[in-house]
Amino acid sequence: MSKITPRETEIIGWMAAGKTAAEIGTILGISHITVNTHIANAKARLGIFKDTALVAAALRNGIIR
């Protein structure tokens, strides 16, 4: 899981809290498209296809709590 960036980790944390890409974008002051790009990049690096699997992997590996 160390392959993901600090920004991707931050976004995954917000995903785990139930926030949408639009809500995360507002919180972080970035576009929802940029949020979706970060999510897609993290999933591609880890070979994960679903958002829920990304959050589960981050929780399982102690990246987020």
Regions found by a protein language model. Name each.
Residues M1-R7:
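Regulatory hinge/linker segments at domain boundaries
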Residues K3, N61-R65:
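Short hydrophobic/aromatic patches at helix-to-coil boundaries
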Residues E8-M15, L54:
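Short alpha-helical "packing" element that flanks the helix-turn-helix/winged-helix DNA-binding module
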Residues W14-A16, I33, L59:
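Short amphipathic helical patch at the helix-1/turn junction of helix-turn-helix
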Residues G18-A21, I64:
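A general structural signal for well-ordered secondary-structure junctions
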Residues T20-A53:
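Recognition helix of helix-turn-helix DNA-binding domains
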Residues D51-G62:
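Short, basic, alpha-helical segments at the C-terminal edge of helix-turn-helix-like DNA-binding modules
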